[in-house]
Amino acid sequence: MLQTFIHSAKRRVSGSTIVFLLGIGAAGACGAQTQKAAGTFGPSNPFYGPSTLPFQTTPFNKIKDSDYQAAIDAGMAQQLKEVDAIANNPAAPTFKNTFVALERAGQLYDRAWNAFNLVSQANTDPELEKIQDYEAPRTAALADAINLNTKLFARIKAIYDQRASLGLDAESLRLVEYQYQQFVKAGANLSDADKEKLKKLDEEESTLENTFMTKLLAAAAADQYSTTDRTTLAGLSEGQMDAAAEEAKAHKLQGWVLPLQNTTQQPDLAFLKDRATRHAIFENSWKRAERGDANDTRATLARLAQLRAQKAALLGYPNYAAWNLTDQMAKTPEAAIGFLDALVPATTAKAAVEAKDIQVLIDSQGGGFTLEPWDWEFYAEQVRKEKYDYDESQVKPYFELNNVLEKGVFYAAHELYGLTFKERKDLPVWQADVRVFEVYDAGGKPLALWYCDYFKRDNKNGGAWEDSLVGQSKLLGTLPVVYNVANFEKPAPGQPALLSFDDVTTMFHEFGHALHAMFADTEYPSLSGTAVPRDFVEFPSQFNEHWASNPTVFAHYARHYKTGEPMPAELAAKIVKAKTFDQGYAFTEILAASELDLEWHVLPATAPLENPDTFEQEALERKHLAISYVPPRYRSSYFLHIWNEGYQAGYYAYTWSEMLDDNAYQWFEDHGGLTRANGDGFRHMVLSRGNTEDLQKMYDAWLGGEPTIEPLLKNRGLK
């Protein structure tokens, strides 16, 4: 199917969507490859034909590591052959012999890649890691070979140009317009000479993105805080001290080491009593990639911004953000920037109130100094403890994993959408802890398969995410096979798995993604389920989070695992109220990073190479976000999301999706809350539609108007 051709490997992590772009501009990545070519691909390979298991799910019990590479390589070859046949079809281009044919293409590759994508992240081993390194650049080259296929694009353009007279239904018309846009965005409309220019820009961009990552990793390692004086770490728990000692041993150092997280603020600053230590750690974080040494990233990122602007100009856009947002819900950088700008006044006003409260606390303790960013976390933690503190050991007995799943996650899905769940212990899994459920619609009709892989393992990537083994498509006759992965602590044998409320929220969040995939009801796989823009894809998952703290749902699952008694009201109230604590600060740092991202990516190609420090300061001042005690969540010099991880001109998407989900939950509250009528309407008008129509129009039609920022501000406690 066409969405595979412009390929991206998606990994959803704790509420965010991290997208590793393997397609456009990575053809130059086909360098040295140490992995041996795959062996012969034949009927003995489990991916040779469609699975005979229910829902065509993957036969994990029959797959050897080597089967993945053989099937992926055969799938690539088959896909290129299929595309070549479409591009060179002697018949005149039609919707059926071009677009429908493309949607049918690549099924072998999809079967193999989707399964490999799962195990390489959730249950990897050295052989799978070698295959990953080998296949990533080959997948990129495959995408380029299709994106820039001149004959194929000529057929696509011919149909696009006459689309209004073809009598296409709405979904088919959407497919034509969307995929034409994707090919144009990839450079298919360029002359051969300009395609070569684009390739060179892409190659340099890819190289510099890797350079940025390499420099930043080295900078973070060089600026970790190391000490042999235990007194400087006063305030850390024994567990934290033990972890710091282990970190020192790993680096063959004496004493203790506190490694840098990639955010500006560091977790340990909330506990360290010594102000000089806090200051030193903050400075290490703030200046980590600005030392004027080999690890300094400023020249690299400035050139990256310039390259992206030049690429956008070549493709006919005024700036990179304008190019990148053409297929997003926001559509234009002006819309994204206007949205962020509107959130700044209320957010910074709340941060100012919080700062005054913290300064009062500092003064009451005889501090004798003015609040600085390295003080915020320490004193905010004292306020949090006083107002909202609860011991995790008090809370966890009320959040037993199976109970949360069945009486919380499944209960909410049943009340809203009529779903029921039956565990399928007869189906193979990729690891013994994985569970499989068949999901049924209200009338008992099979809807999907859903896997959950919840426990931490050494060979599993961190975080939490959702993805699919099989996507829904009426054209292909497939129903969804979806999975959620997390990293909860595994209990000792015979003991219950007890969760924090953050873990509970993660379960609801990832299941929201799963519902989006399971409810898909579309003809074409390229438009199905979660195949939607970044600033929309987190909306269904974040919306589903709300049910974790909904009073009716919470009371149903928050019960002691031994006695069945409900959580005491006072403790439950603390959990709910703590959600809005310190949100002026937290949201200000997010807005600052989001605005910085867009400021870098609205630069025109004619702009001179910018000095990152000057540019950053001036940008924050223009946005009224140059606040001494609230630094950006990421400084430009270590903003990994936008210089390496594919979030350039897209970091705003987290907050945009939050606006959508808060408006949606407000609508539910205004219309009776947790009811089947509300759930069914939301499912049929939003969750089932995938990318089959303009998402803004679709959302507005369901909501009954355009979303506003007011519910978002309310949910964060900012008004």
Predicted regions: what is each one?
Residues 40-64, 74, 255-257, 386-388, ...:
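C-terminal, non-catalytic "cap/extension" segments appended to globular domains
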Residues 489-508:
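Short pre-active-site segment immediately N-terminal to the catalytic Zn-binding motif
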Residues 36-242, 668:
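N-terminal helix-rich structural modules
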Residues 15-28:
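Bacterial N-terminal signal peptides
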Residues 52-67, 116-135, 158-200, 259-299, ...:
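Short His/Asp/Glu-rich catalytic/ion-coordination signatures at enzyme active sites or charged loops
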Residues 2-18:
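Bacterial N-terminal signal peptides that target proteins for export
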